[in-house]
Amino acid sequence: MSRPLYLRTNEQEEAVRSLEWAETQAQLIANEPYHWKWVFIALHNAAQGFMVLALWNGNGLLTLRPKIATKWLTAYENGGPFPTEKLDEFLNLYAKVKDAGNFHTKGSGPFNGKHSHDLSLDKLNSIRNEFIHFTPKGWSLELAGLPGICLDVLELMQWLGQESTAILWYKPAHRVRAKRAIRRLMRTLQQLAKRCDA
């Protein structure tokens, strides 16, 4: 068997692998709390991926920043040139999956989360950004609330990927892997929450 020459991926593989990586990192937290960093980074990437999949609608325009989507449509109508595609901001994608106007098939949406989901997605985004754009400083992150934030995010992903028809999984294995990773990660986070409360 020859060695691969390329790393191949796509939007579904990215979302599922990021979710699986968050689950792998969460299992290490009991021995080393620093793994929370990698859970937040991977879970942010996975949640963003699931929202992108849910908003794809056959052309991906809803996933782009509004000005870019408008320029893309204009270029399409006029035969080009096409703009560089830029994914919309994380919290804008979240607002879009909560907007009924963005879903046109039965059972696809919108996500009707609770206020805690809004707070948790905002917190996930903030913490992830602190890690990704880390400035010179000392920083302490209280562990007690972290499992709850992640559980809320997983509820969004479970709804988008398993309970609604928003995501069209073109490989059944992606759906199965996502379901398994969500279930395992929820279990791990619930155990971590109990430890934080003890």
Where is each model-derived feature located?
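A structural signal for well-ordered alpha-helices, especially hydrophobic packing surfaces
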Residues: 26, 47-54, 128, 132-135, ...
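Polyanionic, low-complexity intrinsically disordered segments
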Residues: 2-7, 119, 136-198
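General structural signal for secondary-structure boundaries
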Residues: 82, 86-93, 113-114, 139-146
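Amphipathic alpha-helical interface segments
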Residues: 2-108
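Generic macromolecular interface patches on structured domains
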Residues: 32, 56-57, 131, 138-141, ...
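Short, structured coil/loop segments at alpha-helix boundaries
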Residues: 5, 12, 20, 111-121, ...
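Histidine-centered, metal-coordinating catalytic motifs and their short helical/loop contexts
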Residues: 110-141
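Charged, amphipathic alpha-helical oligomerization/scaffolding segments
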Residues: 14, 21, 45, 96, ...
